[in-house]
Amino acid sequence: MAFKSLLSFVSVIGALQGANAALTRRVACPDGVNTATNAACCQLFAVREDLQQNLFHGGLCTAEAHESLRLTFHDAIAISPALEAQGIFGGGGADGSIAIFPEIETNFHPNIGLDEIIELQKPFIARHNISVADFIQFAGAIGASNCAGAPQLAAFVGRKDATQPAPDGLVPEPFHTPDQIFDRLADASQGEFDPILTVWLLTAHTVAAANDVDPTKSGLPFDSTPELWDTQFFLETQLRGTSFPGSGGNQGEVESPLAGEMRLQSDHTIARDSRTACEWQSFVDNQPKAQQMFQFVFHDLSIFGQDINTLVDCTEVVPIPADPQGHTHFPAGLSNADIEQACAETPFPTFPTDPGPKTAVAPVPKPPAARK
């Protein structure tokens, strides 16, 4: 079903792009500079410029960009049709509840630490005419666009803001089993996000870092290139873990192959699960797949709980990211001999090893106070 949906999505996008190029009349925006296919998108140009200059440091793939993308997931995934079927409020999905009720939702265990990016984003929401729900997803898309190699992510306006907080227990934790994570995503997506699409969604970890898994360390990247949207994450999670970057023994953490690199237990187990191991390996050195599949799942994730027929597509406002940089490689000191082969169908591909002493990964600096 997922692949049929993707084919339909790609076909529709291609048809719309062709039709738009030939038929769409653009609207002149009130700023006298920009034009848009829908007047509702005009407001986003000012939001974009404000974000780029005053939150993302002139358009950089920094901690603020990483955390803004993370926030999109933690807001959107908080929806459960299964709870609703029991007569229990199951959350509103991509409705902004995590930022509207931060005193409640940022105290949920998987959301610990997100209060910082929510506080940084508050002044931007206050000075622009945009719903909290729309802002969270838009800021995540803009933040990701600053990471070379990323896809252009979807942006919509018209979401309804939350009127009550989401219940606890709806955001997956790094210590959850694959079955728990697969079941949670299937519930939130009404069956669309199967184990394969879960792998696609985890592509976001290519530009992610952990601030709260290890209480003694912050900004621990999940791969050696957290500033790039590449496929090193998929390669490095299949390397044999040898040590912890900090105190070790923390819930949701397993040994990683590189000094300074964090490996989540959930990434480790999904990369080695028989249902997902080959899909995981298929992302290694496949940049188009790392872009297209995440673009697809983000599109759907960003509208969980919303009626797409009431939304306006403003993806054109999101910058097209820079081309990917570098090449797939084994970090210095490691090679195919260090791979824990999990896919039974296809041998792990061979790549060059970086020269020099064994790679150590620098932490991603925590966000300083954004310029108000």
Swiss-Prot record:
Amino-acid positions noted as binding heme b in the UniProt annotation, renumbered to this chain: 205
* The protein's required cofactors: Ca(2+); heme b
- Keyword set, alphabetical order: Calcium, Glycoprotein, Heme, Hydrogen peroxide, Iron, Lignin degradation, Metal-binding, Oxidoreductase, Peroxidase, Signal
Catalytic activity annotation: 1-(3,4-dimethoxyphenyl)-2-(2-methoxyphenoxy)propane-1,3-diol + H2O2 = 3,4-dimethoxybenzaldehyde + guaiacol + glycolaldehyde + H2O; 2 (3,4-dimethoxyphenyl)methanol + H2O2 = 2 (3,4-dimethoxyphenyl)methanol radical + 2 H2O
Q: Which residues are responsible for catalysis? A: 74
Query: Sites of glycosylation?
Result: 129
Recorded protein name is Ligninase C
Native organism is: Trametes versicolor
